[in-house]
Amino acid sequence: MIKSISWNPIFQVMGIFFIQPVVLGVWLALIPKVQSGLNLDTSQLALGLMGTPAGMLMTLHFAGKMANTFGIRKILYIGFPVYFFSITLIGQAGGLYSLLLVLFLVGVCGSLLTLALNVHAGRVEIHTRRVMMNRCHGFWSLGIMAGSFLGSVLESESTVWLILIICASASFPLALLLCLGLPSYENVNSAEMSPALVITQLPAILIGICFFTFGISMTEGAMANWASVYVKEMLGPEAQGTGYGFGLFAAFVAFGRFFGDSLKIKLGTIKVARIFVNISILGLIFLVIANDLWLALAGFALIGLGVSVGFPLAVTAAASIDDKREAPYVAFLSLIALIGFLVGPPIIGFLAKTTNIKTGLTMLFPGLLLSLYLSSKLRSSKPKKKK
């Protein structure tokens, strides 16, 4: 049995949020290198990249029930090593279909970790009576940003497989250490208290929250999958360091999330959501009209800032609807978010094949406008105090 380590629960969960996406960020920076190595065009790459969200979508169908049945701690202890190992297999992909299969496995493992982390963060927020969900996701963004910059630096130094092996090997011990002594906020009767989730009986507020998240996640998915390709298309096929565009996007996502909690307290959830969605729309306009790298980088920064608080606000709102159904509700929210993540990149890729990447990015405008319209559905949830 693993012995406990005494951690501050807030710092602990933020640390786990940071370490979880580091290797993922390395992979995202290496997408152009993998595309060149496998000789894939934009539509083929779009198809291959569908593996991750497809795996997440399939797993999230039963992830909420697994969280209640096995508990958050077991999912984290088992999920981290399998997740890191699955990402390293990307370096062994020999073609489109093997890449699709490996990324599907990454998605399966990633969905369980994502759900476990968000549910645990929500419970820490409730038990400590501290507003911290945005900061947790801020640390997640810092982690993926650090991985992206690391991947850009190492891109020309070795093979994709070796780079991923090194980064995963360094991240795993830190993840395991942070998970030791994780406080148990499990509800011992959660399996009995959480009735089956029936789509037709979902509360209207949850539906509104989910589709607010749809446009945000579609934009995040597009940036994760196409930011490096966008920069490479702008600078030329021999350009190095193309992951810096996504790194800048992730940096501003982190920046926005660190200030998101205080802004939420001062301005309220709905006003913050509207302001930030408008910022992301402005950033997308910059990307579509950019003729030089500096305007494009400004666009990446604004989009990162604009989408930064969307998902954390939605997670807090969804988790606070019903204590007995927090895991299924967060799982359903993640499902809708990942549908957005799934829909955006392939549409952009297929359109970019016949036109260019800028034209493909215009497909993000309807989703962001939907998020702007539905921002009124978010309620200003605050952590519930113990009686």
Which ranges hold each PLM region?
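Cytoplasmic helix-loop-helix junction between adjacent transmembrane helices
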Residues: L103-G138
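Structural signature of the two symmetry-related core transmembrane helices
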Residues: K74-T88, K271-F286
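Pair of pore-lining "gating" transmembrane helices in MFS-fold secondary transporters
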Residues: I5-L30, F104, P203-T219, A301-L305
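Short amphipathic helix-loop junctions that connect adjacent transmembrane helices
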Residues: A29-S43, N225-G241
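Conserved MFS/SLC helix-loop-helix module at the cytosolic interface between two early adjacent transmembrane helices
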Residues: M58-Y97
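Helix-breaking motifs and short loop linkers at transmembrane-helix boundaries and internal kinks
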Residues: N39, G71, Q92-Y97, G236, ...
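Helix-loop-helix hairpin linking two adjacent transmembrane segments in secondary transporters
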Residues: R135-P183
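Helix-to-loop junctions at the C-terminal end of transmembrane segments
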Residues: T59-G71, E155, G256-G268, A352
